[in-house]
Amino acid sequence: MGKKTVYLDNCSYNRPFDDQRQLRISLETQAKLYIQSLVRNEKLDLIYSYVCFYENYINPFENKKLAISEFFKNAKYCVIESHNVIQKASEIIKNGLQPLDALHLSCAISAKVDYFITVDDDILKYSTDELQIFDPVMFIKHWESMGGKDD
């Protein structure tokens, strides 16, 4: 299996800081941390964007902001704002998604990422042929079914 690319939105980056007493949140956190280990171990290439950077920049919690910024250093590429990104985001917004969510998706599509990871239910309902959208747990199931290994 060739190296694949992954894009995580800010909901995913912040998941480990959410209330872990809730089962869904705890499972998604464990899966998200596993995805991070795949990136750190160079099994997946991380792509992020100016939207990730912006949302993290305005995060009022310094400890979260710092941890997420540190992980961005693992990225192979950062998608910057462009006419095409804005235009695609406008199309996505017409399908009912919020502007920042649409920008995340548009950036991922622009970078031709293989996998978009989110814990946002509205994004998970969005359908496109341009990339695969997963929550962290479903991504791990998919990754393993495709022969992905962490060793």
List each language-model region with its residue ranges.
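Acidic, PIN/NYN-like endoribonuclease modules and their adjacent C-terminal/linker elements
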Residues: M1-T5, D19-T29, I109-D151
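HAD-like aspartate-dependent phosphatase fold
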Residues: K4, N14-P16, L44, A67-N74, ...
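PIN/NYN-family metal-dependent endoribonuclease catalytic core
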Residues: Y7-P60
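Anionic, Ser/Thr-rich low-complexity intrinsically disordered regions
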Residues: S12, K43-C52, I58-P60, K64-F71, ...
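Short amphipathic alpha-helical segments and helix-helix/interface helices
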Residues: K32-S37, I68-S69, L105
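Extended, non-catalytic scaffold segments that flank or surround catalytic motifs
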Residues: I35, K76-Y77
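Active-site neighborhoods of divalent-metal-dependent phosphate/nucleic-acid chemistry enzymes
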Residues: Y77-Y115, D121, K125
